A protein has these predicted regions:
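A non-catalytic, amphipathic alpha-helix used as a structural packing/dimerization or gating element
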Residues: 18, 56, 159-166, 272-283
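Phosphate/ribose-recognition catalytic cores of enzymes acting on nucleotide-derived substrates
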Residues: 177-290
């Protein structure tokens, strides 16, 4: 049976995985997802940040059980399809769906007029079945991409990781920074990020830095380096613990966040900063070796 699972699926979190699992019980799963995020078209001022790139979303959806992933370009024309046009042109015309699986918060069609209830009522008339998956909860709150973004932005990385069922990560090229870390014996990989990236709260984290086939335990710093003079934007940088002589510039890097260690602090000079950095690295080394 041709089963179609619909959603944005940013992050491919525990709730999304349940939708794919439900669909997989019914037949071969095609996931239909959207890019750019529909909100960026219908209400650009409310565009959310991204938990993962579209490329990684496709990869994670396949890991979750999808056989095919179709990324639909969500543009102005698409946003103006009525709910019935969406059913006729997209679900049936383009995808030949025999069964559709959605989360209970999935709305569709112009101004999101098509509800899950409406789809389950008209589906049989069009000749396809409909399954509506209840939203998953954790500690009494719904698991959603919005909630996970908030947790990450607040620095609650362990909680976010639980809901994602994996470690949150950022990817980007290693760019040239101020070389400050190199000068003080802690050379860091400075990540170039997409403007859509969801960046954790300023502070120091323990995690992992990967480039190519290599992966190292890392102490990760996010912030503006307030100990040093000058005005700079927020930076995400990772120090590969116990590694010497790495040259990572211009290579694609991945920084995985495992644990939050502390807030960003402003130190009175270099000595107390170096003392704290040694403690951070010791703690990160221990946490990442478990």
């Amino acid at each position: 049976m041709k089963v179609l699972a619909l959603g944005i699926f940013d992050g491919v979190h525990a709730g999304h995985q349940q939708i794919i699992k439900t669909a997989k019980h019914l037949g071969e799963v095609t996931v239909m997802t959207f890019d750019p995020h529909p909100t960026s078209v219908v209400a650009p001022e409310r565009t959310p940040s991204q938990l993962i790139s579209v490329k990684d979303r496709i990869e994670l959806l396949k890991q979750a059980g999808a056989t095919h992933v179709e990324v639909v370009n969500f543009n102005k024309d698409f946003s103006q399809l009525s709910s019935d046009q969406f059913i006729e042109d997209v679900l049936l015309g383009r995808f030949k769906a025999e069964h559709v699986v959605i989360g209970e918060n999935f709305n569709f069609g112009f101004k999101a007029q098509g509800s899950p209830k409406y789809l389950s009522e008209v589906g049989p008339k069009y000749g396809f079945g409909v399954s509506i998956v209840k939203l998953q909860e954790e500690r009494g709150s719904t698991i959603s991409s919005t909630r996970i973004r908030s947790l990450i932005i607040d620095g609650e990385i362990e909680r976010a990781n639980e809901l994602l069922t994996r470690r949150f990560y950022l990817k980007g090229p290693v760019v040239h920074g101020e070389k400050r870390g190199r000068e003080i014996g802690y050379p860091t990989a400075n990540l170039g990020l997409s403007p859509l990236s969801t960046i954790p709260a300023d502070g120091v984290y323990a995690g992992w830095l990967s480039v190519g086939e290599s992966r190292w335990a890392a102490a990760i710093s996010i912030g503006t380096n307030p100990t040093f003079p000058g005005v700079r934007g927020r930076q995400v940088e990772a120090y590969a613990i116990d590694q010497v002589g790495l040259d990572l510039y211009d290579q694609e890097a991945k920084i995985e966040f495992g644990f939050r260690l502390r807030d960003t602090l402003k130190f009175d000079g270099l000595a107390p900063l170096l003392e704290q950095m040694k403690k951070d690295c010791d703690q990160a080394r221990e946490l990442t070796s478990k």
